[in-house]
Amino acid sequence: MSACQTPIIVALDFPTRDAALKLADQLDPKLCRVKVGKELFTSCAAEIVGTLRDKGFEVFLDLKFHDIPNTTAMAVKAAAEMGVWMVNVHCSGGLRMMAACREVLDQRSGPKPLLIGVTVLTSMEREDLAGIGLDIEPQEQVLRLAALAQKAGMDGLVCSALEAQALKSAHPSLQLVTPGIRPAGSAQDDQRRILTPRQALDAGSDYLVIGRPISQAADPAKALADVVAELAL
């Protein structure tokens, strides 16, 4: 497998295997990793992960597990056995849930995926949090959940680029994975708390998840190359 040389993760947000692989075949695994989310995984199951790995890609399995500690830990273990590079769980599942996931990975003798916690979804604003009983700013909730993740031994967090600077300051050892990245001139779509790729890296993000600006581009390979150029890597 060719090691990726950039922080870019391209979201394969498609309903079918054929559509996802059509995009993957236009991308260079040295220039990006790929993210498999709920829609594609539900449609294709574990087979899609193996196929993408065979093409040379490191795979971020973005299923945001959230259940009782044992159930979540067993799901993370299964993901590790697929050979994924990164897997995530919801920090709101609590300290015991995250710690159980850390423990099950630490018991593995083989390669371990990065274990990433999801804080506050980038589509959520203060009024959305108020609607579920949290009368606080998104950044405050992110910092609360980040402290739990650090205590549980997580490798990093999914967070908005707007929270990255504060998180790096508070938890410098955590790797930050940032969705909602939109190259200059792109539409915001349903992501609210966004920055450009360069702004996100400068703010402290370690990995950048980019979807539609690459996946729906007329020339995805060029769109990816343009982002790499924007980052001056």
From Swiss-Prot:
<protein>
    <recommendedName>
        <fullName>Orotidine 5'-phosphate decarboxylase</fullName>
        <ecNumber>4.1.1.23</ecNumber>
    </recommendedName>
</protein>
<comment type="subunit">
    <text>Homodimer.</text>
</comment>
<feature type="binding site">
    <location>
        <position position="211"/>
    </location>
    <ligand>
        <name>substrate</name>
    </ligand>
</feature>
<dbReference type="InterPro" id="IPR013785">
    <property type="entry name" value="Aldolase_TIM"/>
</dbReference>
<feature type="binding site">
    <location>
        <position position="212"/>
    </location>
    <ligand>
        <name>substrate</name>
    </ligand>
</feature>
<keyword id="KW-0456">Lyase</keyword>
<dbReference type="InterPro" id="IPR001754">
    <property type="entry name" value="OMPdeCOase_dom"/>
</dbReference>
<feature type="binding site">
    <location>
        <position position="122"/>
    </location>
    <ligand>
        <name>substrate</name>
    </ligand>
</feature>
<comment type="function">
    <text>Catalyzes the decarboxylation of orotidine 5'-monophosphate (OMP) to uridine 5'-monophosphate (UMP).</text>
</comment>
<feature type="binding site">
    <location>
        <position position="35"/>
    </location>
    <ligand>
        <name>substrate</name>
    </ligand>
</feature>
<keyword id="KW-0210">Decarboxylase</keyword>
<dbReference type="InterPro" id="IPR011060">
    <property type="entry name" value="RibuloseP-bd_barrel"/>
</dbReference>
<feature type="binding site">
    <location>
        <begin position="62"/>
        <end position="71"/>
    </location>
    <ligand>
        <name>substrate</name>
    </ligand>
</feature>
<dbReference type="InterPro" id="IPR047596">
    <property type="entry name" value="OMPdecase_bac"/>
</dbReference>
<feature type="binding site">
    <location>
        <position position="182"/>
    </location>
    <ligand>
        <name>substrate</name>
    </ligand>
</feature>
<dbReference type="InterPro" id="IPR014732">
    <property type="entry name" value="OMPdecase"/>
</dbReference>
<feature type="binding site">
    <location>
        <position position="191"/>
    </location>
    <ligand>
        <name>substrate</name>
    </ligand>
</feature>
<feature type="active site" description="Proton donor">
    <location>
        <position position="64"/>
    </location>
</feature>
<dbReference type="GO" id="GO:0006207">
    <property type="term" value="P:'de novo' pyrimidine nucleobase biosynthetic process"/>
</dbReference>
<comment type="pathway">
    <text>Pyrimidine metabolism; UMP biosynthesis via de novo pathway; UMP from orotate: step 2/2.</text>
</comment>
<dbReference type="Pfam" id="PF00215">
    <property type="entry name" value="OMPdecase"/>
</dbReference>
<dbReference type="InterPro" id="IPR018089">
    <property type="entry name" value="OMPdecase_AS"/>
</dbReference>
<dbReference type="GO" id="GO:0004590">
    <property type="term" value="F:orotidine-5'-phosphate decarboxylase activity"/>
</dbReference>
<keyword id="KW-0665">Pyrimidine biosynthesis</keyword>
<dbReference type="GO" id="GO:0005829">
    <property type="term" value="C:cytosol"/>
</dbReference>
<dbReference type="GO" id="GO:0044205">
    <property type="term" value="P:'de novo' UMP biosynthetic process"/>
</dbReference>
<comment type="similarity">
    <text>Belongs to the OMP decarboxylase family. Type 1 subfamily.</text>
</comment>
<feature type="binding site">
    <location>
        <position position="13"/>
    </location>
    <ligand>
        <name>substrate</name>
    </ligand>
</feature>
